[in-house]
A protein has these predicted regions:
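C-terminal motif of bacterial Sec signal peptides marking the signal peptidase cleavage site
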Residues: 15-19
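Bacterial N-terminal signal peptides that target proteins for export
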Residues: 1-9
Length: 352
C-alpha cells in the first residue's frame, strides 16, 4: 500500500513539474517581442519645371529673361510706305496723328529686335515724350522744330537719319523718298554704342496681364471693329477677331496688314483706343497731342469690348479699369490715339 502511494505521489510530482514548464514557456512566448519588417518609404522629389519670365510689354512667358533696352522707332504709315518692315515683331504699336489725319506709327521693340525696320520717318515732340516715358532708345529720320530741339539736346537717347543718312540709315531702291529710309538691327545697336547709350532695360510698365484668355471674356461681344482718323479710307483700320487663334488681324482698304520682312499678317492680342485732345499748330497740319491728362478709352480683346480709361503713369500711357491697370491678354498690342473731336463715338465702331 505504502509502495503504491509513493508511486502516485511520484506521478503527481512529474505532472506538476511538466505543467509548470509548459506555463513558463507560454509566458516566455508572450513576452518575447515579435520583430516586424518595416516598409521603407522613399519620397520622390517634385519635378520642377524651368523658371519662366514674363515679358514686360507683352506678358508672354519665356525661359529666357529679356533685359534688352526697348527701342522705339517712328515708322512711316503713308500708303506708299506699306507694307512696313519689322512691325510684326513690335510688342506695342502706337498709331497717332502726325499731320492732320495722316498717322504715323511708333513701334516698340523689346522682346525682339527685327533684322530691318522701316520706312523710318520724322519725329514729333509727343513721340519723343512717349519714348522718354518708356526709356526707349529712339529712332527717327527727320523732326518737327520742337522735336529737333529735344533730340539735339539729348532729351532722350536717340539716332536720327538727318545725321546718319547713308551710314546707319540706308535708302531702299524699291521706293522713293521720304518712304525709303530703313535701319537694320546691327545699325540700331551700332547707334546705341556710338551715342554711349545704355543697352539695359530700366523701366517696367504697370501693365497687367491675364493668366488665361478665358478670363477676358467679360464685356460686349465685338468680333469686328473699325477705327477712323477723319474720313480718309487710307487711315481707317478694320480689325477682325480670329477665335481659333485668339488674335486680331488688321486691314486697311481691304488689304491685310503684313510685315514686309516675311509677308506674315500682324497678329494682335489687344486693341486699345485712347481718346485725348488734339490741336492743329501750323499750316502744315502738325498736331499738339495731349498725352498727359488721361481720359476715356476702349479695350478690345478675346472678341470682347470694354469701356476703360487711360492715364499717364510715370510717362507710360497705361490702360486703367476701376482705378487699377486693365488686364490685357498676353501678346502684342496696337494702341490708337484718337481726338476728342469727334471722339470715340464717331471714330470707333464695332459689331458682334
Amino acid at each position: 500500500m505504502e509502495k503504491r502511494m509513493r508511486g502516485w505521489l511520484l506521478l503527481i510530482a512529474i505532472l506538476l513539474l511538466a505543467a509548470c514548464s509548459k506555463e513558463e514557456k507560454v509566458e516566455d512566448d508572450v513576452h518575447e517581442p515579435i520583430e516586424e519588417e518595416q516598409e521603407v518609404v522613399v519620397e520622390e522629389e517634385p519635378v520642377q519645371g524651368p523658371t519662366l519670365y514674363k515679358a514686360p510689354f507683352t506678358g508672354v512667358l519665356s525661359e529666357e529673361e529679356s533685359t534688352r533696352r526697348a527701342v522705339l522707332a517712328t515708322i512711316n504709315n503713308h500708303p506708299l510706305a506699306r507694307p512696313q518692315s519689322g512691325i510684326g515683331d513690335a510688342d506695342i504699336v502706337y498709331e497717332l496723328a502726325a499731320e492732320g489725319n495722316i498717322t504715323r506709327i511708333l513701334a516698340l521693340f523689346q522682346s525682339e529686335l527685327p533684322e530691318e525696320i522701316g520706312p523710318i520717318r520724322s519725329a514729333r515732340d509727343y513721340f519723343v515724350h512717349i519714348s522718354k516715358g518708356l526709356d526707349a532708345f529712339y529712332v527717327a529720320h527727320g523732326y518737327s522744330p520742337d522735336a529737333k530741339q529735344m533730340l539735339q539736346n539729348r532729351f532722350v537717347d536717340n539716332i536720327n537719319g538727318m545725321q546718319y543718312d547713308g551710314t546707319l540709315f540706308n535708302r531702299s531702291k524699291e521706293r522713293r523718298a521720304p518712304h525709303n529710309s530703313y535701319i537694320t538691327k546691327d545699325n540700331v545697336l551700332a547707334g546705341m554704342e556710338k551715342t554711349n547709350s545704355s543697352t539695359e532695360l530700366s523701366v517696367i510698365p504697370r501693365f497687367s496681364f491675364l493668366e488665361s484668355i478665358e478670363d477676358a471674356k467679360i464685356g460686349d461681344i465685338a468680333s469686328m471693329l473699325v477705327v477712323r482718323y477723319g474720313t480718309d479710307p487710307d487711315f481707317t483700320s478694320t480689325y477682325s477677331y480670329d477665335a481659333e487663334k485668339g488674335t486680331y488681324n488688321r486691314m486697311v482698304k481691304g488689304i491685310v496688314t503684313v510685315d514686309k520682312s516675311n509677308e506674315k499678317p500682324v497678329e494682335l492680342s489687344n486693341i486699345l483706343i485712347f481718346e485725348t485732345a488734339h490741336r492743329t499748330i501750323d499750316n502744315v497740319g502738325r498736331q499738339s497731342v495731349d498725352i498727359e491728362s488721361g481720359g476715356k478709352g476702349m479695350l478690345f480683346h478675346a472678341g470682347i469690348e470694354k469701356e476703360i480709361e487711360w492715364e499717364n503713369s510715370g510717362g507710360i500711357l497705361t490702360p486703367m479699369e476701376n482705378g487699377v491697370p486693365a488686364e490685357l491678354v498676353p501678346g502684342k498690342t496696337w494702341i490708337h490715339i484718337v481726338s476728342t473731336h469727334p471722339g470715340m463715338g464717331t471714330s470707333v465702331t464695332y459689331t458682334p
